[in-house]
Amino acid sequence: DLHKHSSSSPLYLAGLEFQEEGFEAYSDGDIVLHALCDALLGSVSKKDLGYYFPSKEPTEKGVRSTQMLEKILEIIEYDKLRVCNIDITIITQRFFVSERREELEENISKLLNIDIGKINIKGKTTDSFGLIGDKQASACLVTILLENA
Protein backbone atom coordinates (compact mmCIF):
# COMPACT_ATOMS: atom_id res chain seq x y z
CA ASP A 1 0.00 0.00 0.00
CA LEU A 2 1.23 3.52 -0.74
CA HIS A 3 -0.20 6.88 0.28
CA LYS A 4 0.83 10.47 -0.26
CA HIS A 5 1.54 12.43 2.93
CA SER A 6 -0.90 15.12 4.01
CA SER A 7 -0.79 17.70 6.78
CA SER A 8 -4.59 17.59 7.09
CA SER A 9 -4.75 14.27 8.94
CA PRO A 10 -2.88 12.49 11.75
CA LEU A 11 -0.59 9.56 11.08
CA TYR A 12 -2.10 6.10 11.58
CA LEU A 13 0.15 3.04 11.58
CA ALA A 14 -0.95 -0.47 12.61
CA GLY A 15 -4.10 0.98 14.14
CA LEU A 16 -2.26 3.51 16.32
CA GLU A 17 -2.50 7.29 15.98
CA PHE A 18 0.60 9.48 16.04
CA GLN A 19 0.51 13.27 16.24
CA GLU A 20 2.36 14.05 13.06
CA GLU A 21 1.57 14.41 9.37
CA GLY A 22 -0.53 11.51 8.11
CA PHE A 23 -1.71 10.38 4.70
CA GLU A 24 -4.05 11.59 2.00
CA ALA A 25 -6.66 8.85 1.79
CA TYR A 26 -10.37 8.14 1.68
CA SER A 27 -10.04 6.20 4.94
CA ASP A 28 -7.57 6.94 7.75
CA GLY A 29 -4.74 5.97 5.36
CA ASP A 30 -3.12 3.37 7.63
CA ILE A 31 -0.64 1.85 5.17
CA VAL A 32 0.26 -1.00 7.54
CA LEU A 33 -3.30 -2.21 8.10
CA HIS A 34 -4.21 -1.70 4.43
CA ALA A 35 -1.29 -3.86 3.32
CA LEU A 36 -2.09 -6.41 6.04
CA CYS A 37 -5.72 -6.61 4.90
CA ASP A 38 -4.64 -7.16 1.30
CA ALA A 39 -2.18 -9.87 2.38
CA LEU A 40 -4.90 -11.61 4.39
CA LEU A 41 -7.32 -11.44 1.47
CA GLY A 42 -4.71 -12.67 -0.99
CA SER A 43 -3.76 -15.59 1.25
CA VAL A 44 -7.25 -17.07 0.79
CA SER A 45 -7.68 -15.98 -2.86
CA LYS A 46 -10.15 -13.17 -2.16
CA LYS A 47 -10.34 -9.86 -4.01
CA ASP A 48 -8.41 -6.75 -2.91
CA LEU A 49 -9.29 -4.30 -0.14
CA GLY A 50 -10.79 -1.77 -2.57
CA TYR A 51 -13.38 -4.34 -3.64
CA TYR A 52 -14.72 -4.60 -0.09
CA PHE A 53 -14.21 -0.91 0.77
CA PRO A 54 -14.69 1.06 -2.47
CA SER A 55 -13.53 4.67 -2.21
CA LYS A 56 -16.54 5.78 -4.24
CA GLU A 57 -18.89 4.78 -1.41
CA PRO A 58 -19.73 7.77 0.81
CA THR A 59 -20.25 5.43 3.77
CA GLU A 60 -16.57 4.48 3.64
CA LYS A 61 -15.20 8.04 3.87
CA GLY A 62 -12.97 8.37 6.91
CA VAL A 63 -13.45 4.73 7.97
CA ARG A 64 -10.85 3.52 10.45
CA SER A 65 -8.59 0.79 9.17
CA THR A 66 -9.18 -1.20 12.35
CA GLN A 67 -12.84 -1.48 11.28
CA MET A 68 -11.71 -2.58 7.83
CA LEU A 69 -9.49 -5.25 9.38
CA GLU A 70 -12.39 -6.56 11.51
CA LYS A 71 -14.54 -7.00 8.39
CA ILE A 72 -11.70 -8.65 6.45
CA LEU A 73 -11.14 -11.12 9.30
CA GLU A 74 -14.81 -12.11 9.03
CA ILE A 75 -14.62 -12.43 5.24
CA ILE A 76 -11.61 -14.76 5.33
CA GLU A 77 -13.04 -16.75 8.26
CA TYR A 78 -9.98 -15.92 10.35
CA ASP A 79 -11.14 -18.10 13.25
CA LYS A 80 -10.52 -21.15 11.04
CA LEU A 81 -6.93 -20.08 10.29
CA ARG A 82 -3.66 -19.87 12.20
CA VAL A 83 -0.98 -17.27 11.55
CA CYS A 84 2.49 -18.78 11.16
CA ASN A 85 4.21 -15.44 10.64
CA ILE A 86 3.74 -11.90 9.34
CA ASP A 87 6.54 -9.91 7.73
CA ILE A 88 5.92 -6.17 7.38
CA THR A 89 8.17 -3.72 5.53
CA ILE A 90 7.47 0.00 5.91
CA ILE A 91 9.19 2.08 3.23
CA THR A 92 9.58 5.70 4.31
CA GLN A 93 11.97 8.57 4.82
CA ARG A 94 9.56 10.45 7.12
CA PHE A 95 10.22 8.61 10.38
CA PHE A 96 12.33 5.84 11.85
CA VAL A 97 10.40 2.58 12.01
CA SER A 98 12.81 1.29 14.66
CA GLU A 99 11.52 3.93 17.11
CA ARG A 100 7.97 2.54 16.82
CA ARG A 101 8.56 -1.13 16.05
CA GLU A 102 7.63 -2.55 19.46
CA GLU A 103 4.35 -0.66 19.86
CA LEU A 104 3.33 -1.44 16.26
CA GLU A 105 4.06 -5.14 16.76
CA GLU A 106 2.19 -5.13 20.09
CA ASN A 107 -0.91 -3.58 18.53
CA ILE A 108 -0.96 -5.99 15.59
CA SER A 109 -0.56 -8.83 18.08
CA LYS A 110 -3.67 -7.58 19.92
CA LEU A 111 -5.68 -6.93 16.75
CA LEU A 112 -5.04 -10.45 15.44
CA ASN A 113 -4.84 -12.18 18.83
CA ILE A 114 -1.48 -13.78 18.04
CA ASP A 115 1.87 -14.09 19.75
CA ILE A 116 4.06 -11.04 19.13
CA GLY A 117 6.91 -13.37 18.16
CA LYS A 118 5.07 -14.16 14.91
CA ILE A 119 5.30 -10.53 13.76
CA ASN A 120 8.32 -8.88 12.18
CA ILE A 121 8.36 -5.19 11.25
CA LYS A 122 11.25 -3.53 9.51
CA GLY A 123 11.86 -0.16 7.93
CA LYS A 124 13.48 0.61 4.61
CA THR A 125 14.23 3.80 2.70
CA THR A 126 14.64 4.51 -0.99
CA ASP A 127 17.91 6.38 -0.44
CA SER A 128 16.17 9.66 -1.29
CA PHE A 129 14.89 8.36 -4.64
CA GLY A 130 11.36 8.96 -5.99
CA LEU A 131 8.19 10.04 -4.20
CA ILE A 132 9.12 8.17 -1.05
CA GLY A 133 12.66 9.50 -1.12
CA ASP A 134 11.35 13.04 -1.55
CA LYS A 135 9.20 12.46 1.58
CA GLN A 136 6.00 12.91 -0.43
CA ALA A 137 4.72 9.39 0.26
CA SER A 138 5.30 6.22 2.28
CA ALA A 139 4.49 2.60 1.52
CA CYS A 140 4.08 -0.75 3.21
CA LEU A 141 4.42 -4.35 2.01
CA VAL A 142 3.14 -7.36 3.97
CA THR A 143 3.72 -11.07 3.55
CA ILE A 144 1.74 -13.48 5.70
CA LEU A 145 1.84 -17.24 6.07
CA LEU A 146 -1.40 -18.87 7.26
CA GLU A 147 -2.44 -22.46 7.79
CA ASN A 148 -5.73 -24.12 8.64
CA ALA A 149 -6.39 -24.16 12.38
Question: PLM features: residue spans?
Answer:
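RNase III-family endoribonuclease catalytic core
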Residues: 2-101, 112
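Short, structured patches in soluble enzyme cores that scaffold and shape functional sites
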Residues: 4, 15, 123, 144-146
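Short, surface-exposed, polar/charged, turn-prone segments marking secondary-structure boundaries
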Residues: 39-40, 113-118, 147-149
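Mid-sequence acidic-hydrophobic segments that form the walls
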Residues: 75, 107, 111, 145
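Short, conserved loop-to-beta-strand elements that form functional interface hotspots
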Residues: 87-96, 101-132
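C-terminal edge-of-domain segments
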Residues: 132-149
